Amino acid sequence: MKIKFVCAAAAVAFACSSQVAFAEDAPTPEITVTGSAAVVSQYRFRGISQSDNKPAVQAAITVADKSGFYVSFWGSSASAGQSQVNIGGTEIDVYGGYTHAIGKTGITFDGGLYGYLYPGAPAGNYFELYGSLSKAYGPFTVKGGLNWAPDQGYFDAYQGISHYNMYEYGEISFSPAKLPALTIHTHLGHTGGGFNYTKEYLDYTVGASYKWKNLTLDASVVGTNVSSDNASNAGFIGSGPGSAYEIYRAAKTAGVVSLTASF
């Protein structure tokens, strides 16, 4: 759904004269509301399956002001029960920030505060500060970003190796001029700090998406460099027989397919 708070202008022809009042251009909407709903073959976050390698359903809504400020809500079904990545069955993200072009450089800045909420496992709630820069070069778009989770209760609850976490990433996407509905995208990220999936690791994504009207189909290969050996030695969440294998299974390379409807 997209709501635009604008006033429409009408063209009026006067029969008694040759003058014509032309329709005014619609002004930029003050506020836009957009949303989406998706079905995914599994929910991966920074390379790690958050849905026990099983399908998930997701939805999002964003309210944005034309000045660049925005607030968003995002939700997904997720792992629960005996899964070693147990986040209580549901994840709800709330985040807000500001995005704006930097002068005439062609670079766009985006930054804000991101909260991760797990109603079924509240000890896992945490927040991050985030920032990114992106720029288009013809059919290519390059983006780099940083997410920082400062000292907070999450790190005390799960006794991570440090009381903060840093995530750095870079992305390159390509949309051919003759087929703009197609996007080929790549992503490489690095996690280091208190999130005890492992002391640190890399995650990667290579995929392609195709947009038709309000539908987007995406097929990607997603994975990490977490091996079965460092899964056994890194001090992951969870313990007991098979824990290391289950974490490795959640982190190993897999194909992920999604279908998203935007409104």
Predicted segments, located by residue:
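Surface-exposed loop and membrane-interface regions of Gram-negative outer-membrane beta-barrel proteins
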Residues: F69-G106, G111-A123
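Outer-membrane beta-barrel "beta-signal"
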Residues: Y210-L215, I247-F263
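Repeated loop/turn-to-beta-strand initiation elements of outer-membrane beta-barrel proteins
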Residues: S67-F73, G103-F109, G138-G144, A177-I184, ...
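Transmembrane beta-strands of outer-membrane beta-barrel pores
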Residues: V39-F45, G75-S79, H100, L113-P119, ...
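Residues that define the transmembrane beta-barrel architecture of outer-membrane proteins
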Residues: P29-I31, N53-V57, G88-I92, I107, ...
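Detector for outer-membrane/organellar transmembrane beta-barrel domains
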Residues: Y126-Y201, S262
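Residues on the lipid-exposed face of transmembrane beta-strands in outer-membrane beta-barrel proteins
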Residues: A37-S41, A59-D65, V94-Y98, L113, ...
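Transmembrane beta-strand segments of Gram-negative outer membrane beta-barrel proteins
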Residues: P27-S41
